C-alpha cells in the first residue's frame, strides 16, 4: 500500500511533527544496541538538566515524539519529549530491558503520555450528548470504554477505568458542552473549575 501511494504524496496527508524528528535515528540506535542516552533537556517550564536514560520505547502523541525509559537522575521510569531535547548522544553504558516492562501495559491506564505509577485506575463516568455519542462510539476516549446508560436521542453514559491525568482533563474540556463528567467528584470539580477560569479570561 505504501509503494502504491508513493506517487500520491501530495494527496495522502499526514499530521506534521514539527520538532524532534532529527533525534529519532539516534534513539532507535540506542534501543537496538541497549545503550544509555545522554540527554541535554529543557522542560516546558524552562528548567534545563542533563539526564542519563535507558530508552525502553517510543511513542507519538499530539504531534510530538516521546521516549519512555529509566532515568538515573530520577531513579524511575519517565517520559522525555524529543522537541524539548537540546542535544542527544549515545553513551558507553549498556542496560538490560526489564522483563516485566511492556510499553502497551505501561500506558494502559492513562489517556495521553503522563503516567503516575503511584496512582491507581478508578471509575470515570462521562455523559455524552447529541452527535458526540456517535463520535465517541467510533473513536473511544479509552480502550476501557463501556456504555452503561442510554436515553434515546438525549444522551449516553460511558464508563471507563483509568487514572486521572492532566491529559484526560484536557480531552474532556476540548469536547466542551457536548459532554458532562458524572464521576468521580474530584474530576468533576476540576473540569468545572477550569471552565470557570476560562470564562474569566473572557470577562
For the regions a protein language model found, what residue spans apply to each?
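Bulky hydrophobic/aromatic content
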Residues: 1-42
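Short beta-strand segments
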Residues: 49-51, 76-80, 124, 156
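Loop-centered beta-sheet repeat module
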Residues: 28-71, 78
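Flexible linker/loop signature enriched in Pro/Ser/Thr and Pro/Gly
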Residues: 74-106
Amino acid at each position: 500500500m505504501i509503494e502504491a501511494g508513493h506517487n500520491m504524496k501530495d494527496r495522502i496527508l499526514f499530521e506534521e511533527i514539527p520538532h524532534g524528528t532529527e533525534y529519532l535515528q539516534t534513539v532507535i540506535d540506542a534501543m537496538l544496541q541497549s545503550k544509555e542516552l545522554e540527554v541535554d533537556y529543557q522542560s516546558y517550564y524552562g528548567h534545563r538538566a542533563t539526564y542519563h536514560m535507558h530508552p525502553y520505547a517510543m511513542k507519538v502523541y499530539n504531534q510530538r515524539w516521546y521516549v519512555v525509559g529509566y532515568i538515573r537522575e530520577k531513579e524511575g521510569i519517565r517520559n522525555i519529549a524529543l522537541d524539548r531535547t537540546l542535544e542527544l548522544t549515545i553513551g558507553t553504558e549498556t542496560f538490560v530491558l526489564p522483563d516485566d516492562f511492556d510499553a502497551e501495559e505501561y500506558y494502559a491506564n492513562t489517556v495521553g503520555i503522563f503516567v503516575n505509577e503511584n496512582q491507581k485506575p478508578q471509575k470515570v463516568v462521562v455523559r455524552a450528548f447529541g452527535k458526540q455519542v456517535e463520535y465517541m462510539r467510533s473513536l473511544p476516549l479509552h480502550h476501557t470504554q463501556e456504555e452503561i446508560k442510554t436515553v434515546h436521542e438525549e444522551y449516553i453514559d460511558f464508563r471507563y477505568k483509568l487514572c486521572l491525568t492532566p491529559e484526560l482533563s484536557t480531552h474532556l474540556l476540548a469536547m466542551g458542552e457536548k459532554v458532562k463528567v458524572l464521576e468521580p467528584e474530584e474530576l468533576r470539580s476540576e473540569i468545572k473549575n477550569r471552565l470557570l477560569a476560562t470564562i474569566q479570561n473572557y470577562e
